[in-house]
């Protein structure tokens, strides 16, 4: 370990859950030394070397975890789809709602009509509850514009959120989310627009950190998604994929072929899909909120992910139609209750594995020397409580890049 003699701040008095290697890796009565926005020393307080700290912060017990990471959201959108919630309760399926002009397309209409400022104000309202829970990094997708102007508008709003609030925002271009109304019956023509116009322009303006697509019978075929991925490769952007949510189309295998950083949903993933993901290093992002709201019965193949050592991340999937979820902690409980994940796996899913799903694992997701000083101090005695309680105690303190977040 590099010798440290000075630091900007020294934090101690709580147990530290580092999440190194995907495990709790508890440091009882730990200490963290920070210079700038980085951790320069971490370990048991009793082993702290002589360090001169410009400032000291003493916690009175509790737990410190890495800052939470919500690695899959659709937080920027216009309109309201609470009426669809009532329809689904009355037995109307997601596919039927979409076929009747609802679903994603109704949000597309509202998003296209909204100004950039209106979208920003609505997204700020949705983002603040996640910040209050200790989220320090979030991914936000486009996908409700479905034309060049509106997709860029959404991505600009997402970038702006990261400028206005103390949170890291990663943006994803999801132009291949649904078929826009002006291209009904012409999916290949729309994919031409995505590949030849939207993705190149988004890359030129540096508005996206990745490209995503929705591979499903009510969205785009594997062949169409492959074209999107090739365009992303040409633009120098990594890829992700909504795959195997409602049916088995081998989208996860396609994602693995392109070394996608993540494949998401995965309720219908097969063993061969999981094997391909394991070989490619693709993270499985599980979305229990959508599973719950859609009353799905096919669980993602958790045991296969364990068997083949595919990292499992969790996310809110915050969106207006299938997962109106503004609580990442609720997803921890749902993952344990619905998917039979362990509390330790669930916490890894919103820290180290979520970081990997965004390609930021070198700087975030665990508490260790050299990484960003992003953490949450909880008034709890055991990390399993984060998944155990439904609602309840919010963080006592959130530290973002070495400073207490207001």
UniProtKB/Swiss-Prot annotation:
Q: Which domain of life is it from?
A: Bacteria
EC number, as in UniProt: 3.5.2.7
UniProt xrefs under Pfam families: Amidohydro_1 (PF01979)
Instruction: Spell out the molecular function terms from Gene Ontology.
Output: imidazolonepropionase activity; iron ion binding; zinc ion binding
One GO cellular-component annotation of the UniProt record comes to: cytoplasm
The pathway noted for it is: Amino-acid degradation; L-histidine degradation into L-glutamate; N-formimidoyl-L-glutamate from L-histidine: step 3/3
Q: Which locations, inside or outside the cell, does it occupy?
A: Cytoplasm
Query: Its catalytic activity?
Result: 4-imidazolone-5-propanoate + H2O = N-formimidoyl-L-glutamate
Describe how the cofactor binds: Binds 1 zinc or iron ion per subunit.
What keywords appear on the UniProt entry?
Cytoplasm, Histidine metabolism, Hydrolase, Iron, Metal-binding, Zinc
Q: CDD domains given for it? A: Imidazolone-5PH
At which positions is 4-imidazolone-5-propanoate bound?
81, 144, 177, 245, 322
Q: Which cofactor does it need?
A: Zn(2+); Fe(3+)
What EC class is this? hydrolase
Q: Name the InterPro entries on file.
A: Amidohydro-rel, HutI, Metal-dep_hydrolase_composite, Metal_Hydrolase
**Per the UniProt entry, what are the Gene Ontology biological process annotations, in alphabetical order?**
L-histidine catabolic process to glutamate and formamide; L-histidine catabolic process to glutamate and formate
Q: Which residues bind Zn(2+)?
A: 72, 74, 242, 317
Family classification: Belongs to the metallo-dependent hydrolases superfamily. HutI family.
Please explain the role this protein plays, according to its UniProt record.
Answer: Catalyzes the hydrolytic cleavage of the carbon-nitrogen bond in imidazolone-5-propanoate to yield N-formimidoyl-L-glutamate. It is the third step in the universal histidine degradation pathway.
| Protein name stated in the entry | Imidazolonepropionase
Q: Which organism is it from?
A: Yersinia pseudotuberculosis serotype O:1b (strain IP 31758)
Its encoding gene is what?
Answer: hutI
